[in-house]
C-alpha cells in the first residue's frame, strides 16, 4: 500500500510561514491553517466521526470550507461535497445515497435522519483528542462528488488521494511552477475544478487568492493588483473580464488563464492574443479529477476549438463500437491515467459500463487531428452547459413527468446570451395545465438553474421507429422560435 505524508501537515512543516490562503484582506499561513484544522478534528472526533465514514459538506467558498475539507482528511473520513445550488430534495437524495453519517454546513438546513452541524459548532464545540492521519494511503477514498449521468440519476464519483495527487502533478508538468505563483480561485470548491486548487495549494506550497462568490469587478481588480499568475475561468467569466479590461491589458505576471467549460469562440481568443493574455483551453470532468487535456497558449489560434493533448501521465483515444479509430474519425472520447476515478459509489453496473481495463468511456464525442489534438464535438450529446453548470435533460424530464397533467416531456438546450445555454421543455398534456404552472412545479423540485426557461406544448413528441425521443428535432423547433 503506497503512502505519502499528510499533505497539509507536511506543507506546514516545510514552509510554515508562507501564505497559504488570502480572502479579501485576510491572510492565513500554512501553519495557521494546520492549527485551525487540528482544532476542528477535535470536535469531529467528539461527535463521532471515524475513519472511513462519509461526511457531507454543504458550504460556500471560504476559509471555513477549506478547514473542514482538510479536517476530514486528517481524521480519515471521506468528504461528500454538495452543490449549494441544488434543491433540498436533491441534497437529501445525495446524502442518503452516499450513506453520510452527518452534515457540516454554513447554511440553514434541517434533516430528520442526519445530524447537522454548523461550522461554529465544529470549530468551537466540545473536543476530544483526535487520531490524526500522519500518512495518506493513495488507494483510499478522499472525496465523493456527484455528477449526473445520461439517465439523469446522479452518481457519486469516488476520488482517491492518489487521484488528487496525480491530477496536481499532471497540472504542474503541464503549466510549470514558479515561486511567485498565485492562483485566483473563484470556481466553487464543491466542483472538482475548484477542489483541485486546494490540492495544488498544499502540494505546491502555492498562495491562493480565494473569491467567496463570483464577482467580476473584484476579480478584474485582483488580476491587476494582487500578483495573480494563474486563474481558472469559463467563457462567460473571460468575456466579463475583457469587457472590464477595455483598451487596457493585464500585467505580464498573469501567465495563464485556464479555460474550461467547452471551446471558446475564436473572436474571444483573438482578443486575448491582441492583449497578450495566455489562454489554455482544457477538457476534463469530475471522473478525471479536473483537467485531463490542455491546449497551451502556443496553439490558441492555430488549433481553434481544440482541447489540446493529454497531460503527461495520461492517455487518450477515440473509439467507435469498441474499436480505436484513426485521425479525423468521430467517436467516443476514452481516457486513462492515474487521475481517473476507479468508479462510482454503490454503482457497480455503471462502473463496469464506464471503466473497462482502466479506460474511462466519457460518453463525449470527438476526434483527433493528425497531430493528436483533441476536438470535442458534443459533451454527452444531450448535455446542457449553463454558466459552467452541467444540466442533464433526463433529470428535468423525470420531474415534468411526475406532474399529473403531463403525459410526455422532452428537454433540450436553447441558446442564451448570458448563460450560454438554458433548458427548454416540450410537453404533451394529459390534462389542463398552463406553462406558468409547469414552470412553478419545476421550481419546487429543481435547482434554479435547472428550471426550464420556456415550456412549449405539442400534440406529440418526435420519436423514431423504436419510439426513442428525437432531441435533434426538438432543437430545430427551438431554433425556429
Curated annotation (Swiss-Prot):
The keyword Glycoprotein does not apply. GO terms for biological process: menaquinone biosynthetic process. Pathway: Quinol/quinone metabolism; 1,4-dihydroxy-2-naphthoate biosynthesis; 1,4-dihydroxy-2-naphthoate from chorismate: step 5/7; Quinol/quinone metabolism; menaquinone biosynthesis. Transmembrane segments: none annotated. Pfam families: AMP-binding, AMP-binding_C. GO terms for molecular function: ATP binding; o-succinylbenzoate-CoA ligase activity. It is an enzyme of class 6 (ligase). Its EC number is 6.2.1.26. It catalyses: 2-succinylbenzoate + ATP + CoA = 2-succinylbenzoyl-CoA + AMP + diphosphate. Keywords: ATP-binding, Ligase, Menaquinone biosynthesis, Nucleotide-binding. CDD domains: OSB_CoA_lg (cd05912). Belongs to the ATP-dependent AMP-binding enzyme family. MenE subfamily. Converts 2-succinylbenzoate (OSB) to 2-succinylbenzoyl-CoA (OSB-CoA). PANTHER family: AMP-BINDING DOMAIN-CONTAINING PROTEIN-RELATED, LONG-CHAIN-FATTY-ACID--COA LIGASE. This is 2-succinylbenzoate--CoA ligase. The gene is menE.
Amino acid at each position: 500500500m503506497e503512502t505519502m505524508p499528510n499533505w497539509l501537515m507536511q506543507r506546514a512543516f516545510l514552509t510554515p510561514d508562507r501564505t497559504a490562503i488570502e480572502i479579501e484582506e485576510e491572510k492565513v499561513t500554512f501553519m495557521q491553517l494546520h492549527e485551525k484544522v487540528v482544532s476542528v478534528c477535535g470536535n469531529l472526533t467528539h461527535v463521532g466521526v471515524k475513519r472511513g465514514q462519509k461526511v457531507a459538506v454543504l458550504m460556500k467558498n471560504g476559509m471555513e470550507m477549506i478547514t473542514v475539507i482538510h479536517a476530514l482528511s486528517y481524521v480519515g473520513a471521506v468528504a461528500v461535497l454538495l452543490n449549494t445550488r441544488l434543491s433540498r430534495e436533491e441534497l437529501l437524495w445525495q446524502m442518503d445515497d452516499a450513506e453520510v453519517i452527518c452534515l457540516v454546513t454554513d447554511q440553514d438546513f434541517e434533516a430528520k435522519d442526519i445530524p447537522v452541524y454548523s461550522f461554529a459548532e465544529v470549530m468551537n464545540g466540545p473536543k476530544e483528542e483526535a487520531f490524526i492521519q500522519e500518512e495518506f494511503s493513495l488507494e483510499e477514498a478522499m472525496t465523493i462528488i456527484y455528477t449526473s449521468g445520461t439517465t439523469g440519476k446522479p452518481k457519486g464519483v469516488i476520488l482517491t488521494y492518489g487521484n488528487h495527487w496525480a491530477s496536481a502533478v499532471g497540472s504542474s508538468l503541464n503549466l510549470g511552477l514558479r515561486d511567485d505563483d498565485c492562483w485566483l480561485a473563484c470556481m466553487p470548491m464543491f466542483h472538482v475544478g475548484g477542489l483541485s486548487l486546494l490540492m495544488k495549494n498544499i502540494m505546491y506550497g502555492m498562495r491562493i487568492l480565494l473569491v467567496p462568490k463570483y464577482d467580476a469587478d473584484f476579480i478584474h481588480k485582483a488580476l491587476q493588483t494582487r500578483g495573480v499568475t494563474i486563474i481558472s475561468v469559463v467563457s462567460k467569466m473571460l468575456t466579463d473580464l475583457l469587457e472590464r479590461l477595455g483598451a487596457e491589458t493585464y500585467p505580464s505576471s498573469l501567465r495563464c488563464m485556464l479555460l474550461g467549460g467547452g471551446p471558446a469562440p475564436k473572436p474571444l481568443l483573438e482578443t486575448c492574443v491582441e492583449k497578450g493574455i495566455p489562454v489554455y483551453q482544457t477538457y476534463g470532468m469530475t471522473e478525471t479529477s479536473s483537467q485531463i487535456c490542455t491546449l497551451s497558449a502556443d496553439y490558441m489560434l492555430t488549433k481553434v476549438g481544440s482541447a489540446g493533448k493529454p497531460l503527461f501521465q495520461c492517455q487518450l483515444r477515440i473509439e467507435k463500437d469498441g474499436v480505436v479509430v484513426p485521425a479525423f474519425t468521430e467517436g467516443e472520447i476514452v481516457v486513462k491515467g492515474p487521475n481517473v476515478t476507479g468508479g462510482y459509489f454503490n454503482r457497480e453496473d455503471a462502473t463496469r459500463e464506464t471503466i473497462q481495463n482502466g479506460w474511462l468511456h466519457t460518453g463525449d464525442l470527438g476526434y483527433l487531428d493528425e497531430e493528436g489534438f483533441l476536438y470535442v464535438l458534443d459533451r454527452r450529446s444531450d448535455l446542457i452547459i449553463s454558466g459552467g453548470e452541467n444540466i442533464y435533460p433526463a433529470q428535468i424530464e423525470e420531474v415534468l413527468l411526475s406532474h399529473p397533467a403531463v403525459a410526455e416531456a422532452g428537454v433540450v438546450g436553447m441558446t442564451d446570451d448570458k448563460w450560454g445555454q438554458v433548458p427548454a421543455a416540450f410537453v404533451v398534456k394529459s390534462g389542463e395545465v398552463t406553462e406558468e404552472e409547469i414552470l412553478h412545479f419545476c421550481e419546487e423540485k429543481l435547482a434554479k438553474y435547472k428550471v426550464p426557461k420556456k415550456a412549449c406544448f405539442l400534440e406529440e413528441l418526435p420519436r423514431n421507429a423504436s419510439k426513442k425521443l428525437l432531441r435533434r428535432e426538438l432543437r430545430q423547433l427551438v431554433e425556429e422560435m
